[in-house]
Amino acid sequence: MSSTKWTDEQRQAIFTKNCNLLVAAGAGAGKTAVLVQRIIEKILDKEEPIDIDKLLVVTFTNAAAAEMRERIGDAISKGLDEDPESKVLRKQLTLLNKSNIMTIHSFCLQVIKNNFHTIEIDPNFRICDETEGILMKQEAIDELFDELYEIENEDFINLVESYASRKDIRLQEVVLELHRFAKSAPFPYTWLLNMAEGFNVGENFNFEETLWADMIMEDMKVLLHGFKNMLQQSIDVILNSEGIDYYYEPFKMDLSFINSLLEKSSFKEFRGEIIAYDFPKLPLKRNKDADKEAKERVKKLRDRVKKRIIELRITLNSYENEFTKKEFIFLYPSMKALSNLVILFDKKYEAKKRERDLIDFNDIEHLCLSILTDKNSEGHIIPSDIALNYRKKFAEVLIDEYQDSNLVQEVIMSMVSRVKGYWSFYNGQLIFNEEEINLEEPQIGLDIPNRFMVGDVKQSIYRFRQAKPEIFLDKYNEYSEEEGTKNRKVKLFKNFRSREEVINGVNYLFKQIMSKTIGELDYTEEEALKVGASYGEEVKGEPIELCLMDKKYEISEEVLKEYNVDEEEALDNIQLEGRLVAKKIQKLVGNNLEGGLKVFDRKLGEYRNLQYRDIVILMRATSNWAPVFVEELAKEGIPVFADTNSGYFDTAEIKTMISLLQIIDNPLQDIPLLSVLRSPIASFTDDELIDIRMVNKNITFYECMEIIYRLYKNEKLDSYYSFYIEDENKINKIIKDMNEKLKNKICSFIEKLKLWREKSIHIDIDEFIWFLYVETGYYGYAGALQAGEQRQANLRILFQRAKQYAKTSYKGLFNFINFINKLKFSSGDMGSAKILGENENVVRIMSIHKSKGLEFPVVILSGTGKNFNMMDLNKNILFHRDLGYGPDYVDTERRIAYPSLVKNIIKNKIRLETLSEEMRILYVALTRAREKLIITGLINNMDKTVEDWLNLSEDKNKVPEYAVMSGKTYLDWIGPALIKHKDAVSFREELKMTSELSNIVDDKSKWKIELWNKRELLKEKVEEDEVEISEKIKETLMNLEESDYKEEIYKRLSFKYKYDNASSIPTKLSVSDVKKQFILDEKENTEELFKKLELRKPMFMEEKKKISPSERGTIIHLFMQHLDLKKAENEEDIKEQINRLIEREFITYEQSKVISSYKILKFCRGELGKRILNSNNVNKEMPFSIEIPALEIYKELDKEIYKDEKLIIQGVIDCYFEEEDGLVLLDYKTDYVNDIEEIKNRYEIQIKYYEEALNRITGKNVKDKYLYLFSVDNYIKID
């Protein structure tokens, strides 16, 4: 029936029968077309036709299911056009409506509805929406915590103290997250208990023989392979260079050591050899004929190897068996208590759902699983009778996007497919055993495998939803490509989407960077995409562009700091990258007549000019970047739309409406009340609000308004308000002097608010919100503003949310506000309403995840210099589906907390899995492009970064795995791969790179690397910002004819705030700010602050990036905070403490170099060190906040007006300790000292406030105050 010319591989995927078939379909390989054609061939097979309702087709989304149904329907209809009398076709068209083409959740729901009686669930159950689920979970966990507090449950209290930092909401977050995580396991309770039992080790526990030890060793071997390459490269240089052959022996010994480690299979031997190895010293020979450049190069490479081996040694030292065993034993009670707490929460949550006849989204899969599974006498999980009936029913089970399956879904599909075997637990893990199982009835004809699975593991990007790409990979590695096997795989890697230039570039890049370690698959020639699309010869393809820009300012750090540029830099960098992209788009589009890019239009069958709709800008995440890009593109006149999933609650119209709802629920909230009063809903001016506040500064703003309202209306004040009125005559005078218009305004607002509060009780929340839209006129007002259609759409979404909420079992304004707040501060924030259609001629900005499955003529991948998000690794308890819990070790009695050894292992595992996911996300992004691909990114210090890339080019075929593992951005992967490409030669020359590259790769891919000048883009930005506002105003006024408008504009522009001086006083100051203020007061003019500043060299001219003085101070302060003086008898003790901080990742090895063990020892042995050692009460890094009169800092203010104005001073005291007759205050300084008196004067005011803070907090006298100066290894006393 099909006229399509299928490739041989596609034909195999369509026609292969009687086996489990895994189809690995690369990007653009036409997998959906193949899947649809396979179904059509099945139902129209002349020998063995299968009715379409006998096929189970599982898709990833409802849209995919609908598209598949439509394609099949079109194919059947086309067949009927050719053969109108065909009974087979007519039957299949009829059956299509009841076909089982659906998402996994739709199938599970069908199973539940058909078999509800087997799981004791009410047949009238409904699925609770996200709104109700959030509220029920919060209610359940609040009740559970209250109950456990009430009975003083010891395990629970210990958990709170250990992992909640005295705020049980943090423990609630841990429980909710772990609950969600456990639900991705087929049997959550079993998983939770097994993971806790992993800590229950016996006396015979030997860490060196555990899975943990093997993981550590395997991870380290990846690094060792990199070291081996570096040493082998060095030996090659030694043998091919003049006069440095005496280096050969020590390098050969090092290489033998690395090779020996790589052969080790025993962790004990591996650990012992690394700890014992002593690097041989390099001979100190001088040879005039020696190749100095080669000599220096191999020394640097060896130093890098030595440094990393020392770091591994430090790590391995911590994995001592007895210490590790004690950790496991100590953590077991807490982890068991945590698992039990999650189970208790789940039971309470389940009870609440059952009370309301509800199930949630997670329940759908788990209830289906419980219907389809049974246990045999051996405890193995086997198909239930119901599952066996499904096996009889379905002739074939076809699964789309198989790489995104999770373990629950895999078990479900195995129950309804004809697979031999059973599931069982082994070492806490659920695994499938492909063995014969004994069933009561023989399953005649059901022994023929019937699973069809299609997907691309390189596009598995949903691990955050607990997708498990290993499910696909295990089959991919096990299945054979040979015909006739029961488990077979077919590879579809011919790409029918992209130009050859895009394909070749993607292949080159991923051959260089993707591996089993990072990406979970070796990207070999066999895995590479093959060109399948034809674009003719009329228009030649273009190279892939990489546009780079150095984000460092070429001015001194001091000047940046003075002007707060460091705070604005991040935003400016996004703006500048957005501007760069705008320039590229303008060039691509041209004037739409000539000069622009030509793209092939498949519908027209010819080339045409590029349009804005043909371009997509992809980003890893759009929340912060997209709005800035939209603004930059709009400035250049480029129509643009950003498809974001956040920012909804930050829009002005939604913030205003939520504030209004908050004050209707409770008007005693100043911030939302002022937000409403300043909005068009109430239209109060700043002056009016100040006049209201003058009634009483010690009560809420609403209470001030209520007092005015009651006194103006001659109503008697009740005792509550009377209590707050110290002088009634004074209040009466304020109200009497108040503008009559303002008093009426207040009364009108109070009366409206009371009416709204009353109305909110009697109608549903959705009706009430729409009533407010109309009553206040705010809906119409929002529509009249710029982007009014968008604003009104956002307000309609709030109304729809309220409508959903009204259908739940929760009622009332208070609960609705709580629900909205929960959404706002969780991942439930939404993007603004979508008001653009798919065919609008605009550039689209979207996340890479949103782009999956789509394609565009031009793709611009931006933000490649942005760091990967590794924030989850900082949580105090980590979760891994296979390895279990990775908690901090917290001993509340000894007040000790640090990452446990098992946490460090899990942390590294999650980090590698996250990097693998990022690798696949990058692959998805680059394979969306049909004709043109552009990559943009910012680099911190271009010259140094590119030099680092060059140092990683020892292997022309692969970027070293250790380098890929340490990557923090996409550019950290792309850069080292491209710098050795033949097309990067001119780029290196532009940067005046002197390093010679012996491994230039002559690959057929085409690249164009551009270095953009940030200064030029910044200059344009500054020039725009410097357009005189007054000129714009003048021009506007010239165009106004009606004098009334002129007068109003002049009046508004000449407005002067009554308390202008007060507005410049911050509410909080740090002690450092106070110090700066006093320095400013002492200067005659500000020129003194600038005249000594010198512009430092730009970073690309510096040989090596140095740690700044401020960073150095921070590092030394951090070490002093953790210094244990009792274990600091010599320099070796101090070095050991430094290494411990490196090991615990408080500082890096590079940062540790600024800590002088000699200087620290001098402090320890000095008078102050001895006094600290003798004290029984030593406190370090103590934060404080104290209130002081503003006049104490801002002496220029009017003393009468500002006598009651207060400031909060904040700071952190480095160290204080107690002696018999009082406290001793100590502050560390790392400044360079020229003049002792100058230092004393500089810090005198700072120490004064530290002293005052200590006096107030402790109530004890500070008898001595010292500055310890590390630059001179001495202290000075402050009087």
UniProtKB/Swiss-Prot annotation:
GO terms classed as biological process: double-strand break repair via homologous recombination
InterPro entries according to UniProt: AddA (IPR014152), DNA_helicase_UvrD-like_C (IPR014017), DNA_helicase_UvrD/REP (IPR000212), P-loop_NTPase (IPR027417), PDDEXK-like_dom_sf (IPR011604), PDDEXK_AddAB-type (IPR038726), Restrct_endonuc-II-like (IPR011335), UvrD-like_ATP-bd (IPR014016)
Gene3D superfamilies associated with the record: 3.90.320.10, P-loop containing nucleotide triphosphate hydrolases
Limits of the UvrD-like helicase C-terminal domain: 526-853
Keyword Cell cycle: no
Highest taxon of source: Bacteria
EC number: 3.1.-.-, 5.6.2.4
Catalytic activity: Couples ATP hydrolysis with the unwinding of duplex DNA by translocating in the 3'-5' direction; ATP + H2O = ADP + phosphate + H(+)
Record keywords: ATP-binding, DNA damage, DNA repair, DNA-binding, Exonuclease, Helicase, Hydrolase, Isomerase, Nuclease, Nucleotide-binding
Stored NCBIfam families: addA_Gpos
Name the UniProt record assigns to this protein: ATP-dependent helicase/nuclease subunit A
Organism: Clostridium botulinum (strain Kyoto / Type A2)
Lineage, opening ranks: Bacteria, Bacillati, Bacillota, Clostridia, Eubacteriales
Gene name tied to this protein: addA
